[in-house]
Amino acid sequence: MESIIQQINQLRTSLRHHEHQYHVLDAPEIPDAEYDRMMQQLRDLEAQHPELVTNDSPTQRVGAAPLDAFEQVKHEVPMLSLDNVFDEESYLAFDKRVHDRLKTAEPLTFCCELKLDGLAVSLLYENGELVRAATRGDGTTGENITANVRTIRAIPLRLHGDNVPRRVEVRGEVFMPQAGFEQLNEEARRKGGKVFANPRNAAAGSLRQLDPRITAKRPLTFFCYGVGLLDGGELPRSHIQCLMQFKAWGLPVSERVKLCTGSDQVIAFYRQIEQDRAGLGFDIDGVVIKVDDLVLQEQLGFVARAPRWATAFKFPAQEQITQVREVEFQVGRTGAITPVARLEPVQVAGVIVSNATLHNADEIERLGLRIGDTVIVRRAGDVIPQVVGVVMEQRPDDTKEITFPSQCPVCGSDIERVEGEAVARCTGGLFCAAQRKEALKHFVSRRALDVDGMGDKIIEQLVEKQYVENPADLFQLTAGKLTGLDRMGPKSAQNLIAALEKAKQTTFARFLYALGIREVGEATAANLAAHFRTLDNLRAADIETLKSVPDVGEVVAKHVMNFLSEEHNQKVIEELEKVVSWPEPQQIVVEEIDSPFAGKTVVLTGSLTILSRDEAKDRLTALGAKVSGSVSKKTHLVIAGEAAGSKLAKAQELGIKVIDEAEMIRLLGE
């Protein structure tokens, strides 16, 4: 079981990182296919071990969090993502699941549409007028991009017709046609400006401009594909008729939509679109297949992060052949050593590819890869390249073996690989400049100490100029030193000093999360903070005491122990304690609390609509409850919100009491 927990935790950590890179930073590091593989592997493991499912698992969420630069918008109806299938066998399995759940053997009618490769947005119309536009964000909260969306001429500022609902929120995709993308990049090259890697990145970057005048100059367009909120009106009872209604209101809808009855017609449509893909004039990465009857959609319902009545049938990644020139090794925040192949540049799906991730030593061994080999490079999801195979018959005589380093290429510290883990790591910790940069970026991030304005470029300069070696050094910075950085004037420097001053007041949970202890995410940091209450108590804890904390197992307990016992980390924490502070937590004496939650282990599952999850946790904890992320025999109560999944099923299986959010609110008020 320990190796399963370790594998699950490792997958969650990797997926969270790559979600942030893709959805928040628009800087993905791995192919979509690799992300999908990891997500499916995690889903499979959690299905086999439902007691290990936690609220903060990537399988229980849609996407990633919004940026701070824009006002946040809470979606009244969550914007869910779609599950994916990658071949005909997987699609037929989806088709069978739908038939089985509906208890019918008759062929079903599906509405098949293009899967656009852009940015999902929500458009809210009140009395026919566009009043708000928002990105998907994490599915619950997005970014208010109304001013930018109003500049997109394809989007009507007012709906047409007499039957417009009082309030209607439509969903669709903002994207950049290929011709406009090429023209934008050509102009950028002439001016020596930023060139975008692909149309999706260009669309995302254009929508996230703080100045709408810049967005207005970008060749963006939009297709509508669904509805979220509807108030004061009616829609047809089939999806394709809804699309026609959107079109009648003046909303753009793709012409490549088709009703298909039975799996043979669906697969034929998929193959036809795959064949026509290159001539569409805009990027797609598959076909979306939806049960057309809205009554049947309601019967099928949802799982935690996606509807049961729809799936995305994705195209195979596009591939080309090239040669490996060299292999270099990069170092991440936790010391993970990632081999990267430097390739003979080759055009794959319209983009010049010169680098590809090799993931780890096991992947190199699996491929049988050598320097000088001819390899197959795939751009999964048309975004990120990876080496998927070696063309052995083209191997030259002078290839070189790839030697995985035993010392860190940045700091020279030993590299170790823990038994059972695929990832090798530098043991240098914050002594390693590469780890220092990534650790500092994490320390100042929004969910950690939230130092507003302290971006990646600033961190990199601070480390390179040796102004900062560890997080404690950040609080010794002066405006004078900061003004010596690129693009840092006196006012910006003063603002950054003020942001650092503000960050000194935090919470124990945020502080623990900011330290960057392996496997300690926000939820685990909050549990550790609630359990130990002070740093001294946490320092004094042994493995068994740590394991008594909700969601902390053997692996996480060892990571915490190792981090706190390392001499360099101890010194950094001591320095931080001199400047960073948080409110002294009040001692909660459970026996003195008159509450139905006192002394109970409580699990929250599904989407809450009245309170946010954080608010619910805070109020439950204040009334003496221990809030856990997983259901076990020790759980006393499960609070089930909308679209509750495996945790609810586990609770019912174990005979644990289940209440809904309304009942929780009533009990909180007693």
Curated annotation (Swiss-Prot):
SMART domains: BRCT, HhH1, LIGANc. NAD(+) binds at residues 32-36, 81-82, 113, 136, 173, 290, 314. It catalyses: NAD(+) + (deoxyribonucleotide)n-3'-hydroxyl + 5'-phospho-(deoxyribonucleotide)m = (deoxyribonucleotide)n+m + AMP + beta-nicotinamide D-nucleotide. Keywords: DNA damage, DNA repair, DNA replication, Ligase, Magnesium, Manganese, Metal-binding, NAD, Zinc. Residues 592-670 form the BRCT domain. GO terms for biological process: DNA repair; DNA replication. Its cofactor is Mg(2+); Mn(2+). One of its GO terms (cellular component) is cytosol. The active site is at residue 115. Zn(2+) binds at residues 408, 411, 426, 432. Its EC number is 6.5.1.2. One of its GO terms (molecular function) is DNA binding. PANTHER family: CHROMOSOME TRANSMISSION FIDELITY FACTOR 18, DNA LIGASE. NCBIfam families: dnlj, PRK07956.1. DNA ligase that catalyzes the formation of phosphodiester linkages between 5'-phosphoryl and 3'-hydroxyl groups in double-stranded DNA using NAD as a coenzyme and as the energy source for the reaction. It is essential for DNA replication and repair of damaged DNA. Belongs to the NAD-dependent DNA ligase family. LigA subfamily. This is DNA ligase. It comes from Yersinia pseudotuberculosis serotype IB (strain PB1/+). The gene is ligA.
